[in-house]
Amino acid sequence: MKQLFATTSRGFEELLKVELTELGAQEAKVVQGGVHYQADDETLYRTLLWSRLASRILFPLIETKIYSDLDLYAAVSGFNWLAQFDERVTFFVDFNGTNQEIRHTQFGAMRVKDGIVDYFERQGKTRPDVDKIQPDVRIHAYLNRENLVISLDLSGEALHLRGYREDAGQAPLRETLAAAIVMRSGWQVGSPLVDPMCGSGTLLIEAAQMEAKIAPQLYRLHWGFDFWKAHNQSAWEKVKNEAIELAEEKQREIQPHFYGFDLDHRVLKKAQKNAQNAGVSHLIKWQQADVAALKNPRLNEVGTVICNPPYGERLGTTPALIALYSVFGQRLKKEFCGWNVSVFSSESTLLDCLRMRASRQFKAKNGPLDCVQKNYQVSERKSDAITDEKELEFNRTSEVAPDFANRLQKNIKKISKWAKQQELDAYRLYDADLPEYNLAVDRYADYIVVQEYAAPKNIDENKARQRLLDAVTATLQVTGVETNKLILKVRQKQKGTNQYEKLANKGEYFYVNEYGTQLWVNLTDYLDTGLFLDHRLTRKMIGELAKGKDFLNLFAYTGSATVHAALGGAKSTTTVDMSNTYLNWAEQNLILNDIEGKQHKLIQADCLQWLEKCDRQFDLIFADPPTFSNSKRMEESWDVQRDHVKLMRNLKRVLSNNGTIVFSNNKRGFKMNLVALEELGLSAIEISHKTLPLDFERNKQIHNCWMIQHI
């Protein structure tokens, strides 16, 4: 009996132990990353040929402790390698693990290589050559602290390489992982298996080979034991011939009941070719189809739907994925009553979009990604969520967030008509109208932006996440916007200047119309878009007040108020902001509206410091400071409630005798210190209600706005 070690992906060890035991392995013992077992020659070859889960099967040669690279070299060079293979072979060393003495795997591999070739030289033999591409012999070294194990890799190439895959598409599953997913799915051999997003077909091919009793390595041409002196050719031929006979016998018995669907016809061609190479092309039916129109191909039977849909690291964007998973869940409940469903994904929250309760779940790794496989049992009662294909887009909302969907539909009907009359491209459709859906929905021309407000601490995070996913799904369905034109943002409570933090670097700008102006927006790169929609009427008012006046825009952001003032006939404009990014944006807004000339100044500065040093006066001032800021570029922190009187003192100094200050901020519960302003010689009238547009009338505390003049 030989002592062997089969490696596998973490999480599959127990599954592998069962498989090896069924293949005849003795004394199977699970450890992290694999299974130790004993086998005679026939069982050894059987596990190599038949294991669907093992990554490699190793025959340990040296097990020792080392405390330096010299110990490593001595252990290797002192071993009788001629008993394993002769000097004419090529070899390669895989080295895994490090410790204080062997800090790099390449160094460890080099010392093992040196020990082997030096051993052969001492025996009077020629040095065997190293081959990194296709060596005759592969040596596997594993170092854990001071414990060293050096093995002969009897697999050769890793066992997940079955030999049937020519081209995998964009996001392939390893064959060993696919086999484990099938084994854990609850699928029963002989029953239908459907993959509605099959990609290159790996899940179906692995399952079909299981049913057809095709050994996963039946078509492998090269093995790690080909040049091994202990190789038992007769035992190997017996095991392989048995596998060939079993596959041929089983082929005559099986009827096709594997079905693969995918939207991409190109990847389906790859799947068909892979299935042909795997010897199961006659068992699988392939069809180009959208999951949104998924049909059950075996209505009178019960089987399993298995799927590895796109997730964060694979294809697609978040809104598109939310919509995909949501409609997938609906089709399952309509078409596959009583069936088992098994879905593998790295995004557990996306699986929540299926709106199904998992009966079992398993953790696994897909490369570096932590993934989960969830199994479901579809109710035997047919879902009435979708009754007709033509009604698909409309009836979905009856299942997903119906209250939110109805409110959004109602708002769209009212606000869109108004916006068209006002010649507006950018406006708010929904603003936390329903407490359980704490988010905003804005339209920017052909785009929709969904902004999630941070949930209160007493709201369960998972529940809030589920509601967001439902709301995104409903928004896509109600608005009819394409998934690539829905932008999803998570908005936390603002701290300091983090509203200016960059989220992405796509650089995708387009302009929207607002009361005859054109303004650039960017929906993806920042938390905000470059245009505060709630201040639309404030900007319009500034344009109406600006004719013939010197205008100052303080805390200017992207300068949209400056554009209105300039087009309203301002004699001059001065735009001040601390951010160079937003000043450049403001400049582009001016250029877009054909506003040019030396009378339009853009100044990058700390607004408070600049104001203290300013020596000219203005007839119209717009100041819209942040609620709070502690930017490193500011000498002091800023709090609008605490510091607004100081700001007014400085603004009064630069305000002409008949001038007007339009002051606004977004602090909820802001209290203007009217007594202090009167002492400064200023009067303030709140005009918040006049600056609140129709699309924000549901949120009367979105901002407060004041008209301030000399007494």
Swiss-Prot record:
Keyword match Transferase: yes
SUPFAM superfamilies noted in UniProt: S-adenosyl-L-methionine-dependent methyltransferases
Residues annotated as domain THUMP: 43-154
Keyword annotations: Cytoplasm, Methyltransferase, RNA-binding, rRNA processing, S-adenosyl-L-methionine, Transferase
CDD domains listed in its UniProt record: AdoMet_MTases, THUMP_AdoMetMT
Annotated GO MF terms: 23S rRNA (guanine(2445)-N(2))-methyltransferase activity; RNA binding; rRNA (guanine-N2-)-methyltransferase activity; rRNA (guanine-N7-)-methyltransferase activity
Catalytic reactions of this protein: guanosine(2445) in 23S rRNA + S-adenosyl-L-methionine = N(2)-methylguanosine(2445) in 23S rRNA + S-adenosyl-L-homocysteine + H(+); guanosine(2069) in 23S rRNA + S-adenosyl-L-methionine = N(2)-methylguanosine(2069) in 23S rRNA + S-adenosyl-L-homocysteine + H(+)
SMART domains: THUMP
Enzyme class: transferase
Classification via PANTHER family: RIBOSOMAL RNA LARGE SUBUNIT METHYLTRANSFERASE K/L, RIBOSOMAL RNA LARGE SUBUNIT METHYLTRANSFERASE K_L
Summary of the function given for this chain in its UniProt record: Specifically methylates the guanine in position 2445 (m2G2445) and the guanine in position 2069 (m7G2069) of 23S rRNA.
Record-stated family: Belongs to the methyltransferase superfamily. RlmKL family.
Protein name as catalogued: Ribosomal RNA large subunit methyltransferase K/L
Gene assigned in the entry: rlmL
